[in-house]
Amino acid sequence: MLDAEQKKNYVAGAFGEFVGTAYFLFMGVGGAVNFLNNAAGSPLPGFAIPFCFGFSLFVNVFIWAPISGGVFNPSITIALMATNPKDFPWYRGILYIVSQFLGALFGSWLIDLIQPEAPNAATLLADGVSVAQGLFMEMFATSVLTMAVLILAGERYGKYLAPFGIGMSLFISALCAGPYTGASLNPARTLGPAIVANQYGRAHWIYYVGPTLGSLLAAGYWHILRILNIDVVDLKNVLNKCKKCGKEDPRISLKHCEECLKDDPKPEKYDIESQN
């Protein structure tokens, strides 16, 4: 049973996911609208639209991560449930997923209400792209984004750079998949604009199945790493050895041995070399 503190934290997390997802869509679509309206006929939108969504994700993850984790994506929520059921049980996942879909719907509605002559932000398959191609494009692009979350945020590596890395992974994935599928990588990002615009397009289901398969693929990668007991590349993986006393120290940035400096505080006398 959940105690009062856990319930409060889960409700706060769900609120953070609702607001964060709404602002992620609002800022991403709003920025894209600005570029589309002011750079029509130029190649700029092809670069700027992925940038808007990537930067919006970066900013909102940075803001909301301390509250909810800054997930904003039902597919990635499923991956978190699959990789960390202790900290992310199914009932927390369902609460987050509902909040994310509602937040995306609210953010899409705000854009439609506030932005004058806002174009349709629905994700649609491009002409000439088959359903299978679109499905696999969404799947593999989402797996990249999910791995960024699992490694940078879920494993607590890159604590301060995690929001930037996650935003950049969306940016590069959107550059790759955008011309073909609209680069959803997020069922909530697809459903909100689709409902507001009442436009679902061809094979709309791939925007739910593809990202979910991609997130599960990334979860599979994560489990393989755990089974093989392979740690993420990090400073602690590098064994450094003080040339004076021979003591190993994992801090690659350390230029001298602290214990040796107690006797002689001149750091230039010591050198630590990396050992394989």
UniProtKB/Swiss-Prot annotation:
Residues 32-46, 115-133, 181-204 are extracellular. It is found in: Cell membrane. GO terms for cellular component: plasma membrane. The keyword rRNA-binding does not apply. It is a multi-pass membrane protein. GO terms for molecular function: water channel activity. It catalyses: H2O(in) = H2O(out). InterPro entries: Aquaporin-like, Aquaporin_transptr, MIP. The chain crosses the membrane at residues 11-31, 47-67, 94-114, 134-154, 160-180, 205-225. A motif (NPA 1) lies at residues 73-75. Keywords: Cell membrane, Membrane, Repeat, Transmembrane, Transmembrane helix, Transport. Residues 1-10, 68-93, 155-159, 226-276 are cytoplasmic. Belongs to the MIP/aquaporin (TC 1.A.8) family. Water channel required to facilitate the transport of water across membranes. Stimulates plant drought tolerance by facilitating the transport of water from the arbuscular mycorrhiza fungus to host plants. PANTHER family: AQUAPORIN TRANSPORTER, MIP17260P. Aquaporins contain two tandem repeats each containing three membrane-spanning domains and a pore-forming loop with the signature motif Asn-Pro-Ala (NPA). AQPF1 has NPS/NPA motifs which is in accordance with the fungal aquaporins (NPx and NxA). This is Aquaporin-1. It comes from Rhizophagus irregularis (Arbuscular mycorrhizal fungus).
